[in-house]
């Protein structure tokens, strides 16, 4: 969750102290992919109630489709290159109306020029495009 649209090299040895600025450790060779709770199906669709927590979930699939697509559209319009990582759990996305929404999302993404690749391919492309681990906002 260190970047919305671009992979990045993970660090090790970060030091976080209360009321102090973070001290970042050195980068490693491990490439992390951009993920976000806002692109995960569980928080938006699943109802979860515990003693001190209520996760409402059960959002309208059409509204979720708009949010997920608009995140891609923003990346497409403002970055020269990037990755959108959607997280789908079979027991969550696998309900009828949600599968219909997922089909619509895939179709809209294709029509908007999205390319679907495996993480391994996205990491390889990132290493070529940003050999020093730098990634900057595009246009």
Which residues does each predicted region cover?
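Active-site-adjacent pocket scaffolds in enzyme catalytic domains
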Residues: 1-80, 130-138
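C-terminal domain-boundary segment and adjacent tail
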Residues: 55-139
